[in-house]
């Protein structure tokens, strides 16, 4: 999708570890694992989380060094309530396995919310669709490619 759209990007492969949190469904482990393996600051490597807000599935893209604030996300999208999607639902909606969920080229179109700290960086890394593969690009290019909105949805 990025190549077809003429969006400059680089793909980075690494050997994924099995982070402690990954086995329990804690998505913090995958992003931190990618950052360590690629020698990057965790604030540059984003995790893509599938969230349900008032029944609608959407993607929250936040730095791996931060935690999603579901109340902030709900307020940002005008929802009464937001919760993490069940892993099975996340995989079905995106076409990717948990730990490799990308905001790019999902199975079905999903709303994408990019966190303010990630949008402020020169370059971010997001999953390229599988564990062990990241793609780096400018936040503005990601916003343009997926129609993302930028909101303050995380805490330290």
Regions found by a protein language model. Give the residues of each.
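Extended, low-hydrophobicity, polar/charged segments
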Residues: 1-156
């Amino acid at each position: 999708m990025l190549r077809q759209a003429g969006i400059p990007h680089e793909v980075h492969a690494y050997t994924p570890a099995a982070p402690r949190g990954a086995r329990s469904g804690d998505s913090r482990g995958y992003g931190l694992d990618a950052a360590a393996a690629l020698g990057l600051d965790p604030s540059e490597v984003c995790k893509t989380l599938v969230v349900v807000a008032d029944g609608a599935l959407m993607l929250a893209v936040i730095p791996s060094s931060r935690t999603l604030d579901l109340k902030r996300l709900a307020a940002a999208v005008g929802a009464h309530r937001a919760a993490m999607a069940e892993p099975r639902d996340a995989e079905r909606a995106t076409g990717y396995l948990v730990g490799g969920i990308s905001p790019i080229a999902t199975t079905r179109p999903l709303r994408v919310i990019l966190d303010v700290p990630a949008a402020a960086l020169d370059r971010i890394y997001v999953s390229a669709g599988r564990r062990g593969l990241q793609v780096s690009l400018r936040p503005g290019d990601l916003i343009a490619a997926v129609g993302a909105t930028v909101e303050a949805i995380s805490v330290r």
